[in-house]
Amino acid sequence: MSGLAPVFARIEPRLQAAKYVRAVMSDLPKRNGWTIAEWVGDASPDATQRLLNRASWDTLGAMNVVRRFAVAPLDAAARPGSLSVGALDESGQEKKGVATAGVKRQHMGCAGGIDNGINIVYLAYVRASAGHTLIAARQWIPAEQISDPVTALTTGLPLDLAFATKGELAIGLLRDAFRDGVRLDFVAGDEVYGACTKLRAFLEEHAQAYVLRIRATFTLTLAAGTFLTCEQAVARHCKQKRKWTIRSAGDGSKGERTYAWAWIATASPVHYLLIRKHRTTGELAFHYCFVPDGQPATLPRLVSAAGLRWPVEGTERVQLSLSHSK
């Protein structure tokens, strides 16, 4: 915690932050205001709530310190040449009432459906053979809360806050990571991020390779100016069995994740469609890939990058219990 000392204006919030971090990193089965207070020896959650809601400290500065602290040991532990991936994902937190900034009825993975809560976009740093860690986060705020001055005031939102999609929030997270010197071989994410043209353009402007999930209806430009959806492209170009190869995309909760994979070149020399097929059901998943000139573009490399996104999906919910707060 000594590295975080400069981000706090007073010693009291710094000491409370140290207690809070120890509780979050503990083996508490459920982490919320009351359980954290009991674990650190506080009589009530007031001190922690004051730290998170009202105390004066540099949030972005703290994120920068933590990001550098988290990335360095993973790089040191990784095998030479192993992939580094920035994995984008969002996670919900259930909330009661309407007083919390960003709260609305929406799809919540932690609730298994539609429920009242907030959504936060996360960026994780994944280093093959070494591990993964969260390095950035931004809360998504619904447009209707930003456009209503009364709601913005009552929930504590800045009156000059501009609406941002989850893809646009991801751009901010990645920009911060790039400024901090975080090097990524690929950026990976699900359909939320693959559908964001601004995010894809940002990554390409920075010569940053990506493997982003897209819907079956995503339109591709193939050779000779042919326009096909992902489904149509697979039906036309991947009929033959020899077009598919069986590869592992890494370990999962039930062992190795092995699928059939294929890829299709587009009219652009730096864009590809990567297709994953379930070996039993035949279900297809599509990834739009960008690999800048001068970087290796191979099927095994793209498959590995796509697979490195999966371990992150449960990180913030399971390990840090971020879906437990009410």
Tell where the protein language model's regions lie, with residue ranges.
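Conserved, well-structured functional cores that handle cations and Mg-NTP chemistry
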Residues: 1-188, 192-209, 216-219
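An anionic, glycine-rich sequence signature occurring as long contiguous blocks
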Residues: 128-151, 155, 159, 211-314
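Basic, amphipathic alpha-helical segments enriched in Lys/Arg and hydrophobic/aromatic residues
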Residues: 323-326
